Regions:
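Short loop/turn segments that flank or connect secondary-structure elements
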Residues: 1-162
Length: 162
């Protein structure tokens, strides 16, 4: 029987931080930008990191996700041709967001000891973005950064939502 009075764990509770690690597997995780929750991305935006974010679109083009940008994609859509450049916050094998309170949940959680669990974390963060709160934060990011492709983004979202 389902206990309707039980509080569901927050994503931060469900996906606790891992121990820092500089092994090859973990460093490779760090090269690919991890995702913030909507709340975390809002804090990062308020902390002045908006111009270093990119807008990733869901495969079905019905919602977006703000994440640390690939080098070369800062303040733009996530473009596949820049994916090999890595995260713009990853410099000299270190994360510039580490210890700032703005490191993405997905980055804090993923670790070589948690093989296969990163995908669950990613999917749960995706659900967090496919919400009104996610859409509202993207609109704030568009205003704050002067995102040059705002009208194109709005056209994509309007034409793909049912």
């Amino acid at each position: 029987m389902h206990n309707s009075g039980a509080k569901e764990k927050s994503l931060v509770e469900k996906y606790p931080p891992s121990e820092p690690c500089s092994c090859e597997i973990c460093v490779n995780y760090c090269k690919r930008p991890g995702w913030w929750t909507v709340e975390e991305a809002g804090r990062a935006l308020d902390a002045g990191f908006g111009k270093r974010m990119m807008l990733e679109m869901a495969p079905e083009l019905t919602f977006g996700v703000l994440s640390p940008a690939f080098k070369g994609c800062e303040g733009n859509f996530a473009l596949n041709e820049f994916s090999e450049n890595g995260c713009n916050f990853f410099k000299n094998s270190l994360c510039q967001l580490f210890g700032t309170g703005c490191q993405p949940l997905e980055c804090r959680f993923c670790h070589h000891d948690r093989r296969g669990e990163g995908e669950k974390c990613h999917l749960d963060i995706e659900k967090d973005w496919n919400t009104k709160a996610g859409s509202k934060l993207i609109e704030k990011w568009i205003r704050v950064t002067g995102f040059p492709c705002a009208s194109y983004y709005h056209m994509i979202i309007r034409s793909n939502r049912k």
